[in-house]
């Protein structure tokens, strides 16, 4: 089965939860999206882009690599460190290189969902983020 979400739907959800817009676009390959973020720097706002690639989906874990250039990657590592102390931070495990593991089973709500479905893949096309899953026998 597939769940298809438009990038606009995902951006609106993030904005409703985080209070900040986070535009998302197709990244040019079936497992990569481009995320952009406006950062206020001194007297002007600068848009920073980051490529996120889903490397692996298995057993409720999602391995993601990120690439935005040396300075951006450093800022992402700092943001990951800060996110670990926030609600949902238990899901995030920094890995070597520019990679993170999202351990969905460590979150009660996501864990309950994973009891009912097997997450197979997350991929992207020009319009949608596509979550491929199969229901588990109950």
Language-model features: locations:
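Extracellular/lumenal and peripheral-membrane lipid-interaction modules
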Residues: 1-138
């Amino acid at each position: 089965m597939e769940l298809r979400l438009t990038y606009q739907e995902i951006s609106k959800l993030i904005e409703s939860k985080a209070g900040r817009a986070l535009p998302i676009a197709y990244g040019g390959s079936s497992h990569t999206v481009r995320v952009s973020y406006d950062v206020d720097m001194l007297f002007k706002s600068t848009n920073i882009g980051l490529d996120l690639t889903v490397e692996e989906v298995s057993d409720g874990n999602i391995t993601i690599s990120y690439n935005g250039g040396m300075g951006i990657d450093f800022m992402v590592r700092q943001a990951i460190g800060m996110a670990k102390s926030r609600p949902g931070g238990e899901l995030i495990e920094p890995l070597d290189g520019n990679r993170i593991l999202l351990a969905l089973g460590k979150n009660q709500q996501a864990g309950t969902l994973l009891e009912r479905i097997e997450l197979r893949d997350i991929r992207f096309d020009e319009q949608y983020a596509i979550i491929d899953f199969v229901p588990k026998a109950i």
